[in-house]
Amino acid sequence: MTLQQCRSLNKCLYKMSLEFNYYKTMVLSVKTQIVAGRRKVAKPIFFLAILKAIEKQLLLENKIRYTDELENIYKSLYMEYGEVLSPMKYPFYHLKSDGFYHLQGDFPIKSPTPKLLKEKVDFAYFDESLWKILQKKEYRQELQKAIEDYFKLKKI
């Protein structure tokens, strides 16, 4: 590898590291509700479900669909963390308000139901930079740990 290639690679790694830190901050800053003194962790667990779907190669492109497979991963994570289940329809729809996750399709939907989300939303997608970051296993693992630590998610 030439010195020029190395400098270019270092610039790329530095840029990706900056982008990773930016998105990690955004993910940890998702808006959550507090009900009866407890923070609802639906959005963080939904994000973890997406990470797991990428890991299992169920998501091969930046098109996140409301599927039974994704919902099963989401529900199993709720059980692993011992949290009270919040339906996936809420984070699937409302994560769009956090700036890095977007919906493509025919809406607005006032009160999302799984049926309406499947019919009206073609797919959800991340910012392209975030999607590229999530293709690297080490970044997914670091994000998972950060989410678990920040939102105090402990596997039971």
What does each of the following model-derived ranges do?
Residues 1-156:
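Intrinsically disordered, charged low-complexity linkers and terminal tails
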